[in-house]
Amino acid sequence: AAQGLIQRMPPDLLRLGLLGGLLGLDGTAVGQFMISRPLVAGALVGWAVGDMELGIGIGAVLELYILVSFPTGGARFPEGATATAVAVAVAAPFSGAGAVPLSFAVGLVWGQVGGASVNAQRHFNSLLIPEARSNTALSFPPGISHLIAIAVDFLRGSAVTMTGVLAGRLLIGSVIYWWPLPSSASTGLLLVGGAVSVGVLLHDLGGFR
């Protein structure tokens, strides 16, 4: 049954799930080599789906949207790597003016889902901290706890990415032909949104002085 389920999956889904897990790890758990930034993640996912130009383009614009979020403290923020991976992977199989903007919207929404999953994982990780042991805490040696947290983060990133790609492709496939704008207007719409995000960032930093 499991083999049949795998055979019915889109051929690139497992590959995207693996990449989503690695990008999720780079966010905080392992490395922080910045490959989880939208621009880099977009290029990697674009390569994985066979359209690096698409990946770089979506990643570059998403970078403008994500720059306004400063992931500090325990606040919840959209996960840029998840948003980018889902947006690029959802857009890749489709053509037409609506493919990128609709996939972009799906990616932004799923970035919020990714952010919520990070918060849930932080709660799980708190149960692994030796100093915070209580009746509900899990009892593992520190080294094992660290490995468990890394494995859970990888699985979280993979699961969120795969479900986002599946849901996004199903949604876009049913509504893409209703998209009313031509390609030039669609691109302009995304860039205007990015410009607004950059304006908010500049305002928060004090603007031009």
Predicted feature descriptions by range:
Residues 100-177:
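Helix-loop-helix junctions within the multi-pass membrane cores of secondary transporters/permeases
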Residues 6-14, 45-56, 90-106, 174-180:
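Helix-coil boundary and interhelical linker segments in multi-pass alpha-helical membrane proteins
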Residues 6-77, 81-82:
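Hydrophobic transmembrane alpha-helices
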Residues 15-20, 38, 42, 46, ...:
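Alpha-helical transmembrane segments in multi-pass membrane proteins
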Residues 23-25, 46-48, 66-69, 90-95, ...:
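Hydrophobic alpha-helical transmembrane segments
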Residues 14, 147-209:
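C-terminal transmembrane helix-loop-helix hairpin of multi-pass membrane proteins
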Residues 64-106:
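Long, highly hydrophobic alpha-helical transmembrane signal-anchor segments
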